[in-house]
Regions:
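Substrate-binding pocket helix/loop in short-chain dehydrogenase/reductase
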Residues: 102-103, 107-115, 213
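Short, small/polar-rich loop/turn modules that mediate ligand/substrate recognition or access, typified
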Residues: 92, 179, 184, 243-245
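C-terminal helical subdomain
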Residues: 187, 208-243, 250-252, 277-282
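Active-site loop-to-helix junction immediately N-terminal to the catalytic Tyr of the SDR YXXXK motif
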Residues: 106, 153-162, 173, 198-201
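Conserved glycine-rich cofactor-binding loop
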Residues: 16-20
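Alpha-helical segment proximal to the catalytic Tyr-Lys
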Residues: 131, 135, 176-180, 241
Length: 282
């Protein structure tokens, strides 16, 4: 928990800010005193969210419909934010799309849809705001939401894995290249955080009744929205001013559990271990 008004005076753009994790992060930013622009393609959802968050937090939130795949639309969204708030301090690239499928069943268009939203959208927003910050000699902070499999890949979500890996490379590359301008670039790699839209696409029936996403997490639970919002708020605040080029995993230990060759032995009962020990002593 950051102190009250830890983000006072800052203006933050959150793509995909109308629902799910984007909304949760926006809520906390507002509670900490920031002004926030939320953007997605669905203006009705954005306006409903903005009205609810104004009432809930008393903060200033601007809803702008924007297709991040289109650079001109991104530039217009940023310009409108400057008109409203006078400055932009933080860009949070959160817009995403995902679904599960054997790769050979995908059309090239299905691949393009995900890569265009996740990778091209993040690049468009980053380039547009970065150009303005550099021209105006203003420091800034970029925070990208990736995923744990951005580093190692994952079967059956190849478009998302490819796009998120690209965003991860973008994060680390610009952390070095733009540091001289006072621009920090970091990322968060969440594990399982249940959201209504993504969850239904990644765990449709019959998978939902057969797979327990929490089962592979050592803490034996999925993440809570506020936990991710806490981390995001820290990374966009001045308290993390020396953090640059980092990808922070927040997954309850799931990634490490899957990486260890013998981690699955956790399922063995004490009796099974007794048998193994007796066998090894022979």
């Amino acid at each position: 928990m950051l102190r009250d008004n830890a983000l006072a005076g800052k203006t933050i753009i959150v793509t995909g800010g109308g629902t799910g994790l984007g909304r949760a992060m926006t809520t906390y930013f507002l509670q900490l005193g920031a002004n926030v622009t939320i953007t997605s393609r669905k203006l009705d959802v954005l306006e409903t969210t903005a009205a609810e968050l104004r009432q809930q937090t008393g903060g200033k939130v601007l809803a702008i419909a924007c297709d991040v795949r289109k650079y001109d639309a991104v530039e217009a969204m940023i310009a409108r934010t400057y008109e409203e708030f006078g400055r932009v301090d933080v860009l949070l690239n959160n817009a995403a799309g995902n679904f599960i499928s054997p790769t050979e069943r995908l059309s090239h268009k299905a691949f393009d849809v995900i890569v265009d939203i996740v990778l091209k959208g993040s690049y468009n927003c980053t380039l547009a705001i970065g150009k303005r910050w550099i021209a105006e000699q203003q420091p800034g902070t970029i925070l990208n939401i990736v995923t744990t499999y951005a580093s190692v890949g994952s079967a059956f979500v190849v478009p998302s894995a490819t796009a998120k890996a690209g965003v991860l490379a973008l994060t680390r590359s610009l952390a070095v290249e733009w540091a001289k301008y006072g621009i920090r670039s970091n990322a968060i790699a969440p594990g399982p955080f249940p959201t209504e839209g993504a969850w239904s696409r990644l765990f449709p029936e019959p998978l939902a009744s057969q797979l327990d996403p929490a089962a592979s997490v050592p803490l034996k639970r999925v993440g809570q929205y506020q936990e991710l919002a806490n981390l995001a708020a820290y990374l966009v605040s001045d308290f993390s001013a020396y953090v640059n080029g980092e990808v922070v995993t927040i997954d309850g230990g799931e990634w490490l559990n899957g990486a260890g060759e013998f981690n699955k032995l956790e399922a063995l009962t004490p009796e099974m271990w007794d048998t193994i020990e007796q066998t090894m002593r022979r």
